[in-house]
């Protein structure tokens, strides 16, 4: 399983660990085990987490590779309280993930020339081969889960904003053949539901078929159970729809969403918290040298700045 744009909150909760969640720095690995009945042997689930901003998306090449692709579920974590970053984050990471998957498939074709067709078949089995929206869908070739976090903050937002965000995420999830789940670390019921969803993908436990699409409540939409008719039109007036030049429905929804929530670029390393200053990575001897070096740099910069005053 591969989480992108995540922090350790989710693995700490999922594995019932008694520790404080910490921000994920770049790419991190952890694992969990689950007992198999009365057997001594346990199932092992491998989890990679990518954090630190969209500019690190190239690191997904490590966990997503030809040897792991057939056993990988992609989990995209989106912050519901930050809609002005949501589309940019989602689009950047999904584009990178799809490109990496295509690259892996090219390598895998050397051993199995029909690997892409097999993955397509599995994708449609997840969504439903007879789904009425089939001609409008473009499911990911590996299982995809989209988790909207900070529902506790989101539920206090303006109702119109919540409606736009929920409809848009339902549309994107539906087109990509993803399961959609809203989550809050402060609500035990949502923790339990998210834990069940992750357990299904990690250990093949029974999946919940509960469908919740009311924008006033936390969304829970299993892959293939939504429909374009139920989602409705993008949040644009009929007059605006006629003026928008979009190549496909996804672009139309992008125009609608970004018109409502102008996007901020999160692809800047400068906006990411410096892990070197994080207490969890403290190294006294190295930190002392770093302080000395920073002091020298500051002194030099100060002198250069005031040289011609």
What is the predicted function of each stretch?
Residues 1-179, 184-193, 198, 270-280, ...:
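TRAFAC-class small GTPase G-domain
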Residues 203-273:
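Eukaryote-biased recognition of long, low-complexity, charge-rich segments
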